[in-house]
Amino acid sequence: MVDFAFELRKVQDTGKIVMGAKKSIHLAKVGGAKLIIVARNARPDIKEDIYYYAKLSGIPVYEFEGTSVELGTLLGRPHTVSALAVIDPGESKILALAGGKE
């Protein structure tokens, strides 16, 4: 079993992520991400756009079980994070969460 919090911190340290719903939706549209993570309580229109464009681009989406506040806290941010895109997983195994290709 992959520990989400551990792997998220690992990808933040060794890989490349982009935080924010607008940037994640943009990367879903252009196919520039390997995985998109969305908070459980993200606005419905944001989730709908992310799932729609990610499906078109073949990008896996992982729905984080916690809230956007908890996701922000895991990332060490003092604000909410509704969505983030993993561009480079680095040394983490975070792509295994959503069945993405490593």
From Swiss-Prot:
UniProt entry tagged with the keyword Metal-binding: no
GO CC field: cytosolic large ribosomal subunit
Keyword Ribonucleoprotein belongs to the record: yes
Pfam families linked: Ribosomal_L7Ae
Swiss-Prot/TrEMBL GO biological process terms: translation
Keywords: Ribonucleoprotein, Ribosomal protein
Any GO molecular function: RNA binding
Assigned protein family: Belongs to the eukaryotic ribosomal protein eL30 family.
Assembly: Part of the 50S ribosomal subunit.
HAMAP family: Ribosomal_eL30
Protein name, UniProt field: Large ribosomal subunit protein eL30
UniProt organism field: Thermococcus kodakarensis (strain ATCC BAA-918 / JCM 12380 / KOD1) (Pyrococcus kodakaraensis (strain KOD1))
Lineage: Archaea, Methanobacteriati, Methanobacteriota, Thermococci, Thermococcales
